[in-house]
Amino acid sequence: MNFLRKIVKTCRDEDTQKPPLVSAPPDDDDLWLPPPEYIPLKEITGKKNMRNFCVNGEVKVCGPNGYSFRTLRHILRSFDEIYSGNQRMIGLVKVVVGLALSGAPVPEGMNWVYKLRRTLIFQWADSRGPLEGEELEYSQEITWDDDTEFVGLEIRVSARQCHIQGRIWCINMNSRACQFWSDMSLQTQRSEEDKDSSVLLE
C-alpha cells in the first residue's frame, strides 16, 4: 500500500533533493479582500527607475488527485521564506508567478502547466530592484503534503531587460493575480510621479 502511495504522489521519475514542505492551510484560508495599496495601472507617465523586462514564466502544478487554489494560495504565503533566487528581483518573480497562475493551464501528464511570456513594465522605488542590465534565471520546487493531499509547484522565471514596448501588469484590483500577490505579500506603494501606478519596494 505504501508503495502504491509513493507512485501516486510522485510527479517525476527521478528522486531529486526534496523541496521545502509547507504546513497545512487553516480552515479560513479562502477569506480574502483586495489590499488597498494595489492600484490599477493605466499608462505609466513617470520614468523614474522604470524598466521593461521580457519575461518567461512557468508554474507546473503536480496534483495527482487534483488541487485547489486554496492550497496554492497557502503555499505561496510562505514564498518570502522559501524563495531561493536573486533577492533584488523577488518582486518581479511574484508578479510573474501571479500572472502565470491567473491564466489557463495546459495538462501535461499528471501536471498542469501555466505559462506566461510577455514584455512587462516594472517600476521600482529608489535603490530597489535589479541592477542595470541584470538578468534572472530562477528555478525552484515547493511541495505541500499531508495524509490526504499532495501538491508540488515547479516554478521557473527568466527575465532580461529589453526595449520592446511593455504592458502594464495590474489592470483589475479584483483579479486573481492581485489575490496571489496579496498571498505572496508583494510590497508596493503608490508612485510619486503617477497616482495611477504602483512602484515595487522589492
UniProtKB/Swiss-Prot annotation:
Query: Misc remark for this entry?
Result: Most abundant protein in the virion.
Recorded GO CC terms: host cell cytoplasm; host cell endomembrane system; membrane; viral envelope; virion membrane
Superkingdom assignment: Viruses
The site (Involved in the inhibition of stress granules formation and contributes therefore to virulence) lies at 95
Q: What name does the UniProt record give this protein?
A: Matrix protein
| Record text on subunit structure and interactions | Homomultimer. Interacts with nucleoprotein and with the cytoplasmic domain of glycoprotein. Interacts with host ATP6V1A; this interaction plays an important role in virion uncoating after viral entry.
For the keyword DNA damage, the answer is: no
Topology in membrane: Peripheral membrane protein
Q: In which organism is this protein found?
A: Rabies virus (strain silver-haired bat-associated)
Record remark on domains: Late-budding domains (L domains) are short sequence motifs essential for viral particle budding. They recruit proteins of the host ESCRT machinery (Endosomal Sorting Complex Required for Transport) or ESCRT-associated proteins. Matrix protein contains one L domain: a PPXY motif which potentially interacts with the WW domain 3 of NEDD4 E3 ubiquitin ligase (Potential).
Q: Where is this region: Essential for glycoprotein binding?
A: 115-151
> Which Pfam families did the record assign?
Rhabdo_M2
**Localization in the cell:** Virion membrane; Host endomembrane system; Host cytoplasm
What this chain does, per the record? Plays a major role in assembly, budding and uncoating of virion after membrane fusion. Completely covers the ribonucleoprotein coil and keep it in condensed bullet-shaped form. Inhibits viral transcription and stimulates replication. Plays a major role in early induction of TRAIL-mediated apoptosis in infected neurons. Inhibits the integrated stress response (ISR) in the infected cell by blocking the formation of stress granules.
Q: Where is this motif: PPXY motif?
A: 35-38
Segments forming a coiled coil: none
Which Gene Ontology terms describe the biological processes this protein takes part in?
A: viral budding via host ESCRT complex
Q: What is the lineage of its organism?
A: Viruses, Riboviria, Orthornavirae, Negarnaviricota, Haploviricotina
Q: Does the keyword Membrane apply?
A: yes
